[in-house]
């Protein structure tokens, strides 16, 4: 899944 962190994306 991709978590929206600010203006970027972090896969968790």
Swiss-Prot record:
> What would you give as a GO molecular function for this chain, any one?
toxin activity
Task: Print the keywords alphabetically.
Answer: Neurotoxin, Secreted, Toxin
Work out whether the entry's keyword set contains Secreted: yes
Q: What tissues contain this protein?
A: Expressed by the venom gland.
Q: Where does this polypeptide localize?
A: Secreted
Q: Does the keyword Signal apply?
A: no
Q: Name one GO cellular component term.
A: extracellular region
Where, if anywhere, are coiled coils annotated?
Answer: none
- Please explain the role this protein plays, according to its UniProt record: Neurotoxin.
Q: Which family does it belong to?
A: Belongs to the neurotoxin 09 (Tx3-6) family.
**Can you name this protein?**
U7-ctenitoxin-Co1a
* Organism lineage string: Eukaryota, Metazoa, Ecdysozoa, Arthropoda, Chelicerata
């Amino acid at each position: 899944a991709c978590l929206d962190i600010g203006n970027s994306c972090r896969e968790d």
